[in-house]
Amino acid sequence: MWNMGLLFLIYYCVSIYSAKGDTKDGQVLPLDVGALAEDAGDAEANGEDTPERNSESSVLDTTLAFEPQASTQSTPIHGAVPTWRPKRDNCTPPAIEQFPQPLMNKWARQHGGLILHILVAVFTFFGLAIVCDEYFVASLDRLCEELKLSPDVAGATFMAAGSSAPELATVVIGVFFAKDDIGISGVIGSAVFNIMFVISVCALCSGTVCQLNWWPLVRDCFFYCVSILVMLIIIFNDVISCFESVVMLLCYVGYCVALHFNTELERWALGLNLPFKLPSKEEQSALVTYKNVPEGSYTQESVGQTQGQKATDDSETRSAKPQSDYQDYSDPNPTWDPNAAWGDESQPNPVANPPPVDDWGMGHSGQENMGYHADQPESVVTGDGPPAAVKSGGQVVSTQATSAGGNDYYKSTDKQREPRRDPLLRPMEGGLPALVSWYVVYPIHFLCKKTMPDCRQEQYRNWYPFTFLMSMVWISFYSYFMVWMITVIGSTLAIPDTVMGLTFVAAGVSVPDALSSIAVIKEGFGDMAVSNAIGSNVFDILVCLGLPWFIQTAIIKPGSHVNVISKGLAYSTLSLFSTVVFLILSTHLNGWKLDKRLGIILMVWYLFFITLASLYELNVFGYMNPPECPSTY
């Protein structure tokens, strides 16, 4: 320990001497003070090529794992700021050393022990999905109701945090524990996973063709592009400051404000002369948000044949209007009964119409809206915003309007038509696969049930603050073990952390979003599934990255900055623009419908993007990611 302290003192003195020698050029380079010991790669990057520095570099390379206490002394060098993590040009500090030492050494892991780490990582994926879906989202649902937030703001803040909690926890662990790029790469990979893989699986799993509305898709993609641009500008110089993290958070505040005025923006957009097929009023209703038909019966000819065959005079009048007349479509229509549109007559309405026939000549009878229940009128929300949140298991929080005279704040939908089945009870149906899956997730359900009250149940509805806190603890627990196991796997297989983040971590943290979108697409909610997948990406980039960076640079170590080690992440972020353009272009060329053909196209593009991004991180196209430094773990 005494020898290491002496080496650091020698290194510090040489650094000051070298920096003073550079003043003859009229420029003083910043010196990183008070963080970790830096090696010869930093000296070369700063132009410090003195003989004394070169003689010390070979000795200092042996102290890469040395982590001294942060110095409180100031330095006379102008512009010096403490860094959170040293950047090295010769090698990347091993992230595995930031975690407890594994029980198995590297030789044991390479000869079969790695399978245990893989199983633990998969188990953490299940844990994150169950905790987020069953408890965390439910507590946020009740929290939004108690705060009486507007539906759009609730959906863009708390409910978005529900499905994106694993991404946020992963970035926090990557910044404060692993101290590497696994959090950033996980967010980038999760963004591609949501916008390509999840939507592709939704299209492949759906047995119907869902006609998509262009406005929610274009709106979400626009803000998604803005968030990508902000992220690209911020990480392009490989450092993140406090000001830049604040900019990211303010951008998300602007996104919430835009969602609050979604009605005005939508009216303005629909008043434009755009070459898109506008949906009917039923399609824009809070309850009828999609059009779906059996996949084999969708043809362009059938569209033309059924345009003039409307079930009511009102729909005939709408079909004859020009596009510019649709700008007032969202005004309340008291003569249209949403219950009648679904074939539900359990609620009386003085002006009830028969179930309308859609553009494909098919009625809506027998189809269930997941955000509305006839026996629970209080669960319906008003507001003209996009879907606030989607929860797997047949539960959706809709944030669109039913009438102008209703409540304009968020309402919980935690009451269900059918009682929930106790997950601790052994399944009687499904055979061996259901029994095996029950045994696998039984420990997760058991621990959650014993430590957190289910605030969806009537007797625990007021316990949502405790459920919220405990679910955050469990999410942090599973996320920590997930990042730990992924780091061990990558270190054992000599795979960079950024590649593991783009692939395995991205898939693991996106499980809640994937389950939500797949659940609603099976019910025919194409717009809702796509909006859930794209909208969560805005939260992932602006909040899941901006908030941990702000805490680190403004609260924990004011004046410091966070370093981005891999240069390939900037190229991966730039490539995210291609995913947005490809999604909109392919959807438009496919007639704004979600079918199996679009699903296959998106799946191929996802595999291509992940392969290209991984090759960047593996230095196939140039020196982007320094190799990992030797480690004794």
From Swiss-Prot:
Task: Please give the residue ranges for the topological domain Extracellular.
Answer: 22-111, 179-181, 263-427, 490-500, 557-568, 619-633
Transcription as a keyword of this entry, yes or no, is no
Positions on the Cytoplasmic side per record topology = 133-157, 203-220, 449-468, 522-535, 590-597
A Gene Ontology MF term for this entry?
symporter activity
Task: Please cite one Gene Ontology biological process associated with this protein.
Answer: calcium ion transport
Compartments annotated for it: namely: Membrane
- Which stretches are tagged as biased composition: Basic and acidic residues? 411-422
Q: Which residues cross the membrane?
A: 112-132, 158-178, 182-202, 221-241, 242-262, 428-448, 469-489, 501-521, 536-556, 569-589, 598-618
Question: Could you tell me which residues the Alpha- repeats occupy?
Answer: 153-193, 506-537
The protein's matches in Pfam families, at most eight in alphabetical order, are given as: Na_Ca_ex
Hey, what's the signal peptide range on this chain?
1-21
Query: Which keywords appear in this protein's UniProt record, sorted alphabetically?
Result: Antiport, Calcium, Calcium transport, Ion transport, Membrane, Potassium, Potassium transport, Repeat, Signal, Sodium, Sodium transport, Symport, Transmembrane, Transmembrane helix, Transport
| Role according to the record | May function in the removal and maintenance of calcium homeostasis. Transports one Ca(2+) and 1 K(+) in exchange for 4 Na(+).
> What family does the entry list?
Belongs to the Ca(2+):cation antiporter (CaCA) (TC 2.A.19) family. SLC24A subfamily.
Recorded protein name is Probable sodium/potassium/calcium exchanger CG1090
